[in-house]
């Protein structure tokens, strides 16, 4: 977390610069010097407020996760509570459309995933993100099937989101949101049919 006193205008500037530099040279090449140059600030500001590159990566991921959460919430708020399939698709769109599908965000996500396996602070952020996604999905799925079934199907959808997202991230053409929606809805319809026959 950044120290108190960091001017609010600087945070978005530094977060954006971090993503831009990661997009351009990768995480290992994204030095404090390059990030500060991109942001138009001194390296000392990054070291003072964030304790270096690691702290800035953590703040950048917090920002990306906040934006993902806000986007999902906005999309859900536009839909009736009973429109469960539409609401599930809104959750998918929050993950595959707009800001989350920009090249600089995708590359920052990939860096975050690899680092979060070995870093407790980043691992906590990943767990928060995973719990939030599963919570959104289960809320909608429980209206369509039993709680136990909803738990299993939510895990399946989350795995598909991660897998499709990763494949899209590594594809030069990027993430195909329409194809992602088709694949996940096909899985969901098959699960609904299967569980309705139980």
UniProtKB/Swiss-Prot annotation:
Gene3D superfamilies hit by this protein: Tetracycline Repressor, domain 2
InterPro entries: BetI_C, DNA-bd_HTH_TetR-type_CS, Homeodomain-like_sf, HTH-type_TetR-like_transc_reg, HTH_TetR, Tet_transcr_reg_TetR-rel_C_sf, Tscrpt_rep_BetI
UniProt pathway: Amine and polyamine biosynthesis; betaine biosynthesis via choline pathway [regulation]
Annotation: DNA-binding region: 31-50
Keyword Transport among record annotations: no
Entry-linked Pfam families: TetR_C_6 (PF13977), TetR_N (PF00440)
GO biological-process terms attached to the record: glycine betaine biosynthetic process from choline; negative regulation of DNA-templated transcription
UniProt cross-references to SUPFAM superfamilies, sorted A to Z: Homeodomain-like (SSF46689), Tetracyclin repressor-like, C-terminal domain (SSF48498)
Top-rank lineage group of the source organism: Bacteria
Keywords, ordered alphabetically: DNA-binding, Repressor, Transcription, Transcription regulation
Chain ranges of the HTH tetR-type domain: 8-68
GO molecular function: DNA-binding transcription factor activity; transcription cis-regulatory region binding
Function: Repressor involved in the biosynthesis of the osmoprotectant glycine betaine. It represses transcription of the choline transporter BetT and the genes of BetAB involved in the synthesis of glycine betaine.
NCBIfam families per record: betaine_BetI (TIGR03384), PRK00767.1 (NF001978)
HAMAP family: HTH_type_BetI
Full protein name: HTH-type transcriptional regulator BetI
Record organism: Vibrio vulnificus (strain CMCP6)
Gene assigned in the entry: betI
């Amino acid at each position: 977390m950044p120290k108190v006193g960091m001017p609010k205008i600087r945070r978005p500037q530094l977060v954006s610069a971090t993503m831009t530099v990661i997009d351009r040279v990768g995480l290992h090449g994204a030095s404090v010097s390059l990030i500060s140059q991109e942001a138009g600030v001194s390296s000392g500001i990054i070291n003072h407020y964030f304790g270096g590159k690691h702290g800035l990566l953590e703040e950048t991921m917090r920002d990306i996760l906040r934006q993902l959460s806000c986007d999902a919430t906005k999309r859900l708020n536009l839909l009736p509570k009973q429109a469960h399939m539409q609401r599930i698709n809104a959750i998918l769109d929050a993950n595959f459309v707009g800001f989350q599908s920009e090249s600089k965000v995708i590359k920052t996500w990939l860096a975050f995933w690899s680092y979060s396996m070995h870093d407790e602070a980043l691992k906590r952020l990943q767990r928060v993100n995973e719990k939030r996604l599963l919570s959104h999905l289960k809320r909608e799925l429980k209206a369509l099937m039993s709680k136990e079934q909803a738990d299993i199907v939510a895990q399946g959808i989350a795995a598909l989101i991660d897998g499709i997202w990763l494949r899209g991230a590594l594809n030069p053409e990027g993430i195909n949101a329409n194809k992602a929606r088709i694949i996940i809805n096909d899985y969901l319809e098959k699960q609904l049919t299967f569980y309705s026959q139980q």
